[in-house]
From Swiss-Prot:
Protein name, UniProt field: Ribosomal RNA small subunit methyltransferase H
Protein's organism: Staphylococcus saprophyticus subsp. saprophyticus (strain ATCC 15305 / DSM 20229 / NCIMB 8711 / NCTC 7292 / S-41)
Superkingdom as given in the UniProt entry: Bacteria
Compartment list: Cytoplasm
EC number annotated for this UniProt entry: 2.1.1.199
């Protein structure tokens, strides 16, 4: 059974200005905490499209949301397919969309899923258990240069080359099969002095591999682009991110759509095509409260950004 404390639960949903008869999309159903809070505000005419690529999360959510099942459509898919999902459901536009990005606590806490550097398990890290690519393939089969690139880009790890070299040397002897085997190899690639600073030495590499396995950043970019088109005028999008790469991507995309295209000089009236698509509701991200942090330490890195659609 999932046990998951949702981060910034009220803020994420309240900023959507929920309408009783509205149609909303939860792109990251997870433990269903946000979904339950939203559904409690929806009337019988309202509807929630709940997306997750993890079938375990969906099965658990059906239990959590059992009193509201008549208002929920569950979709096992990647959120990068929002347009396709809504088309299949004959929904043209929705009133709001929200994301709670990152790994849900249950995925981290179930050792067999291979996300955690604290528990020994087979290298896996697949959010969608039906996909073939896992952390094992990334660690044991990807070329040195490709490993360096993902460690640097997705983990912002300054010892990317040294760690990738250690992985290459170790896997030539025998495959690196478990999370703790990988942790040991990562430690070999980081100077002792640096290992003692900045949290767990494997944290950034595990993040990078997880992002690569699940293609998280490009999936989010695709999804957010589609979400901006899928929301009605005056509807909103809430996004909770957990690391700087996602937050930067979200911030930049909101800024681009808020700015709109460059307007040709000398036009007496600005055509609608040149007006902004959205406005940012909060210029600076909302961060977790002390209360949030007491309930869930993972909220420490969470940032919430909200945008309102203008046309």
């Amino acid at each position: 059974m999932f046990h998951h404390v949702s981060v910034m639960l009220k803020e994420t949903i309240d900023y959507l200005n929920i309408k009783e008869d509205g149609v909303y999309v939860d792109c990251t159903l997870g433990g269903a905490g946000h979904a339950l809070y939203l559904l409690n505000q929806l009337g019988d005419e309202g509807r929630l499209i709940a997306i997750d690529q993890d079938t375990t999360a969906i099965e658990n959510a059906k239990e959590v949301l059992k009193e509201h099942l008549h208002k929920v459509t569950f979709v096992h898919n990647n959120f990068r397919k929002i347009t396709e999902i809504l088309n299949d459901l004959n929904i043209e536009k929705v009133d709001g969309i929200y994301y709670d990005l990152g790994v849900s606590s249950p995925q981290l806490d179930v050792p067999e899923r291979g996300f955690s550097y604290h528990h020994d398990a087979k290298l896996d890290m697949r959010m969608d258990q039906t996909q073939s690519l896992s952390a094992f393939e990334v660690v044991n089969e990807w070329e040195f240069e490709k490993l360096v690139r993902i460690f640097h880009r997705y983990g912002e790890e300054k010892f990317s080359k040294q760690i990738a070299r250690r992985i290459e040397q170790n896997r030539e002897q025998k495959p690196i099969e478990t999370t703790l085997e990988l942790v040991d190899v990562i430690k070999e690639g980081i100077p002792a002095k640096a290992r003692r600073k900045g949290g767990h030495p494997a944290k950034r590499i595990f993040q990078a591999i997880r992002i690569a396995v699940n293609d998280e950043l490009s999936a989010f970019e695709d999804s957010l682009e589609q979400a901006i088109d899928a929301v009605k005028m005056d509807g909103r999008i809430s996004v909770i991110t957990f690391h700087s790469l996602e937050d930067r991507l979200c911030k930049q995309m909101f800024q681009e759509y808020e700015k709109g295209p460059d307007v040709p000089r000398g036009l007496p009236v600005i055509p609608e095509a040149y007006t902004p698509k959205l406005k940012r509701v909060n210029r600076k991200p909302i961060i977790a409260t002390d209360e949030d942090l007491e309930e869930n330490n993972r909220a420490r890195s969470a940032k919430l950004r909200v945008a309102e659609i203008l046309k």
